[in-house]
């Protein structure tokens, strides 16, 4: 029987692995978005998901340069190692990196310690992101959010329509059958695009190991100065974190499953100092990686409310 007449199941076609399928889907989403929008940008938060997203983008558009810039919304409260890693990667890869900080929030001295997590996140993240998107007139923004991270992200589409005020309305979500993505929008509207939506935390780590993707050292276990506060191990990254009465930083072997502003990000005690050890911990984990993110605890439905206000 000729190959043309063989049943599809009998054709000697190479089978893609699980990670190859995820990679192909993400690359397709990126290329489709670039083809259908005028001025896209990639949000770069410096974490493991952003590192994977950047790696996929470099693959998607190789051997050419990325057809969009990277945007980092800098709250001024990221871990020092994160900023050093960001600058080193941008220099190494020759990236077009935009760094934006809310000037009003900076002038008012808004911070997670002085104003609390909710005000800090709104002013220095949500408002700052909206300002940056408006300033540079971006009509589509790639992000590294995944559906397995948190409930509101689980129900958001891969291509998420935002209003002219950058708000997300869950009732206006579009169907995405057969990997078909509707990238149409009215004047003033914009899109948030999530190529990693169908990845899990385990997928991310397996891909990082497979592709040897550089990541911030904070993900690996090491002795770090921490204080226990409200059930979280908070790293004392610089002198701006005031110690409460009776608090004394102590060195513990910890690492971070997720990264954000350091006073709002809890570490986990761990001996995992290599990628295989991190993968083993991830397989055994019974809690979400975002259990250490204080901003997710700002009341019931906190993340969905933030997204409706323009948060990523």
Swiss-Prot record:
Pathway: Sulfur metabolism; hydrogen sulfide biosynthesis; sulfite from sulfate: step 1/3. Keywords: ATP-binding, Nucleotide-binding, Nucleotidyltransferase, Transferase. With CysN forms the ATP sulfurylase (ATPS) that catalyzes the adenylation of sulfate producing adenosine 5'-phosphosulfate (APS) and diphosphate, the first enzymatic step in sulfur assimilation pathway. APS synthesis involves the formation of a high-energy phosphoric-sulfuric acid anhydride bond driven by GTP hydrolysis by CysN coupled to ATP hydrolysis by CysD. Heterodimer composed of CysD, the smaller subunit, and CysN. SUPFAM superfamilies: Adenine nucleotide alpha hydrolases-like. GO terms for biological process: hydrogen sulfide biosynthetic process; sulfate assimilation. The keyword Ribosomal protein does not apply. It is an enzyme of class 2 (transferase). It catalyses: sulfate + ATP + H(+) = adenosine 5'-phosphosulfate + diphosphate. Belongs to the PAPS reductase family. CysD subfamily. The lineage of its organism: Bacteria, Pseudomonadati, Pseudomonadota, Alphaproteobacteria, Hyphomicrobiales. GO terms for molecular function: ATP binding; sulfate adenylyltransferase (ATP) activity. It holds the Pfam family PAPS_reduct. It comes from the Bacteria. Gene3D superfamilies: HUPs. This is Sulfate adenylyltransferase subunit 2. Its EC number is 2.7.7.4.
């Amino acid at each position: 029987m000729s190959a043309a007449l063989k049943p599809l199941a009998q054709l000697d076609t190479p089978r893609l692995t699980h990670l190859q399928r995820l990679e192909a889907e993400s690359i397709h989403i990126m290329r489709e978005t670039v083809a259908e929008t005028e001025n896209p940008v990639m949000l770069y938060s410096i974490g493991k998901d952003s590192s994977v997203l950047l790696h996929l983008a470099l693959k998607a558009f190789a051997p050419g340069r990325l057809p969009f810039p990277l945007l980092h919304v800098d709250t001024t409260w990221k871990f020092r190692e994160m900023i050093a890693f960001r600058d080193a990667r941008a220099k190494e890869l020759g990236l077009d990196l935009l760094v934006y900080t809310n000037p009003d929030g900076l002038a008012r001295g808004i911070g997670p310690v002085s104003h609390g997590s909710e005000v800090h996140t709104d002013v220095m993240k949500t408002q700052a992101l909206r300002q940056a998107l408006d300033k540079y007139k971006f009509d589509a923004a790639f992000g590294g959010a995944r559906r397995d991270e948190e409930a509101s992200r689980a129900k958001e589409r891969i291509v998420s329509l935002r209003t002219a005020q950058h708000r997300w309305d869950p009732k206006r979500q579009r169907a995405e059958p057969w990997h078909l993505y509707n990238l149409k929008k009215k004047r003033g509207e914009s899109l948030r695009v999530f190529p990693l939506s169908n990845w899990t935390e385990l997928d991310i780590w397996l891909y990082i190991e497979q592709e040897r993707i550089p990541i911030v050292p904070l993900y690996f276990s090491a002795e770090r100065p921490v204080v226990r506060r409200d059930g979280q191990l908070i790293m004392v990254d610089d002198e701006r974190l005031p110690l409460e009465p009776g608090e004394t930083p102590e060195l513990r072997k910890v690492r971070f499953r997720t990264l954000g502003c350091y006073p709002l990000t809890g570490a986990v005690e761990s001996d995992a100092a290599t990628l295989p050890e991190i993968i083993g911990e991830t397989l055994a984990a019974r809690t979400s990686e975002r259990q250490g993110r204080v901003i997710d605890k700002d009341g019931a439905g906190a993340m969905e409310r933030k997204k409706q206000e323009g948060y990523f």
